[in-house]
Amino acid sequence: FNNVKVSGDTRFDRVVSILERDNSLDFIEQFKDNTTTIVIGSSWPKDESLLINYINQSSDDVKFIIAPHNIKQEQISNLKNQIQKKTILFSENVETRLIASLQEYNVFIIDTIGILTKIYSYADIAYVGGGFGNPGVHNILEPATFGVPVVIGPNYSHFAEATALVNMEGCISIQNQTQLNEAFDLLLHNEDERLEKGHICSTFVQM
């Protein structure tokens, strides 16, 4: 798959440089609290309709960070209201409460921009949104560079890196609720599978 990566491709250059910077975020570390965490990045309503169903029936030994594509207040409120787990917004906590209280929550909604890439460094599993829309999935290289296995929707054929990673089995493409549930359950309950797919992702970015 070396032909996928064009020499001088700024997308690859940028994500590789991400590893050289400080990606720590104290409030994410407090929220994660050494718990297995799924980071959902750039999600759209179609993604969220499936993800919310999974979140609401999930056990408390997994946490979720959601960074929606649309962070308008109405959209964020609607998202939060559908989630039955203990949920907090970035705007509710980071500047107004003690960070230590974050570990009490199951879901953290990031209603701000500019920090998603750093958040991916804390992910055990990533879901990258946009794959149910047109033109398709958002940037999967950001979580991949941290060695995180990625789950996406079905529309990815216009993106060479997504196509390559699906073919290499570092990334799982899903089309419906059942497939999403199966993908997350596989990655949550099979550590070897999770680590292997993550290794495929990180190796691909650095090729």
Task: Give residue spans per PLM region.
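Nucleotide-activated sugar donor-binding and catalytic core shared by glycosyltransferases
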Residues: 1-207
